[in-house]
Design a protein with these regions (language model features):
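Glycine-centered loop/turn motif at secondary-structure junctions
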Residues: 36-38, 73
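Short S/T/G/P-rich N-terminal loop/turn motif that feeds into the first structured element of a domain
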Residues: 1-34, 47, 85-89
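Charged/polar, solvent-exposed surface patches and flexible loops
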Residues: 23, 27, 43, 67, ...
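A short linear hydrophobic-aromatic micro-motif
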Residues: 38-44, 78
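An amphipathic, aromatic/His-enriched active-site/gating alpha helix that lines ligand/cofactor pockets
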Residues: 59-85
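Generic detector of leucine side chains in alpha-helical contexts
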Residues: 5, 10, 20, 52, ...
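Short, well-ordered beta-strand segments in beta-rich or mixed alpha/beta enzyme
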Residues: 4-8, 42-64
Length: 89
C-alpha cells in the first residue's frame, strides 16, 4: 500500500499538540479501517524551525489520505505520495 505525507503547520510554542494530533490521526485511521477503507497511521516528523509537522499514512489513494487527515482535524497544507527508502519502484 502506498504511503502519503500530510504537511501541516505546528507552531513552536504548541506544547503537547503534536501528541494530540497523533492520537487523532491514529483514531481516524482506525475508524476508516473499521468502515472498510484500510488506512494506517505510520508516524510523524516535526520540524520546529519551519513550524511544520508531517504525518505519514498508509492508504489506498491520495484522496483517502486527505480524508483521514481531514477527519483527524490536521488541516493539511498538502498531501503527497511518499516513497520510503528501500521501496523504490
Amino acid at each position: 500500500m502506498p504511503s502519503y505525507l500530510v504537511e501541516t503547520f505546528l507552531a513552536r510554542d504548541a506544547k503537547g499538540e503534536r501528541r494530540l494530533r497523533e492520537g487523532r490521526a491514529r483514531s481516524a485511521a482506525d475508524e476508516m479501517t473499521r468502515e472498510g477503507t484500510r488506512v494506517g497511521f505510520e508516524g510523524s516528523i516535526y520540524v520546529p524551525e519551519d513550524e511544520l509537522c508531517f504525518f505519514t499514512f498508509a492508504a489506498p489513494s491520495t484522496r483517502d489520505a486527505a480524508l483521514v487527515a481531514q477527519r483527524a482535524g490536521l488541516a493539511p497544507l498538502r498531501v503527497v505520495e511518499a516513497i520510503p527508502s528501500g521501496k523504490e519502484e
